[in-house]
Amino acid sequence: VAEEPRTFGRLCLEFIGVLEKHRAVKTGLAMQRRIHTMLLRHTSKEIVNRKALTINPAKTCQPIGAMYAALGIHGCLPHSHGSQGCCAYHRSTLTRHYKEPVMAATSSFTEGASVFGGQANLVQAIDNIFTIYDPEVIAVHTTCLSETIGDDIPQIAGKAQADGKIPAGKYVIHANTPSYTGSHVTGFASMTRAMVDYFARSSGQRSDRINIIPGYVEPSDMEEIRRIAVEMGVRIILFPDTSNVLNRPQTGRYEMFPKGGVTVEELMSTGDSRTTLALGRLASGSAARALDTQCKVPCEILDLPIGLNATDAFVDALRKAAAVSVPDTITTERGRMLDIITDMHQYFYGKKVALTGDPDQLVSLSEFLVSIDMQPIHIVTGTPGKKFETRIREITGEVPHRVNIGAPGDMFLFHQWIKNDPVDLLMGNSYVKYIARDEDIPFVRFGFPITDRIGHSYFPTVGYRGGMRLLEKILDALLDRKDRDSPEESFELVM
């Protein structure tokens, strides 16, 4: 009888040993699987300075942004002045992101047009488009080929007008968007500026409307910006506006030109508005300044309203510009967002984050993360800009860690930084999933393009409601990882 406790103890120890061996085998197999499926195994830790080589760019080309902006005009057909392959790529990229068919025309360059210029192609295209599709506006954007040739789009459009190819009450606008410079964000900015250059007029009679240029954001974000203005009782002109264009409902009836988008009449009246709020310096600033110069409409350039502070600034600017008060509904939304931050702060605190995306989005997102005591330490954008780097340095000045900023940078450098200094969370577009898988890091999809999930065109990330959704996505990623890695004795039901 005296030996039974010792025998039982030995059995317990043997059983625990078996469990530990089993756990070690499982861990080893999991690591082995990860090693054998490394998708970016060529990425080295050693960082070599590169000036003339980009590996896995953190951006896409200007015409994609120009095409997206053009879709924000009601009854507009974007037109790619270049080869068929260029247009097919631009359309397919937007279609994969939005899961909606994106319509656009092309000048269909052949060898002859590539040598002698695309004037004949564009004049014929303008005639065909108005005859067959009857849009209100054709928005022409250039490509590498047509820019290299030196095609003069205003002159070609003028010839089409003189030849009677453009019907009365119809319009052809253009933006110069060569792919070998800038990015999709600068392409968006150029086409938005073209809307002002071609349409904005001043009658000398000021209206009570506020112009809002939303920046390169999702249709859901544009919808949310409009909703906030409506809640506050402010009359606005939002341009461009892709809501109800690239997130339109399924009605069972095909429409070449959906109901959404800013109308030509609204664009023409932007020159009489009280003021302009430009959200995002890079994507919206140029158009806002052009309105100020051409029509004397004063402008204020704000950060994208992502996160608590940036949304506060937007709501306050809207309140001051329209001389209205903030309604209780908006105050309630703000309080709910603040409540989430307060309740779950322990899970945000001190977490290191790596971000990649567009400059305007990264500025607001970095500020938001810092405000909830997270630490953005690797920040990469494919769009060059010294002002961006300066602003990020200001935002992350009190982060107790070295902060790496790539502007311009690429995904290869982004991955190298992460290898050398691991993080707790990744945020970026769908291409970041390869890094997330190889390095086994929680990942939140944010930005453009997102081709492997749905919801970004329907659920906003701007405003207080959008901020709550962003907090939820960040928390889900962090807490899912905590659940996955917690040993049995600390696997919690309530967090």
Residue ranges with predicted function:
Residues V1-M495:
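An N-terminal assembly and electron-transfer interface module characteristic of large anaerobic redox
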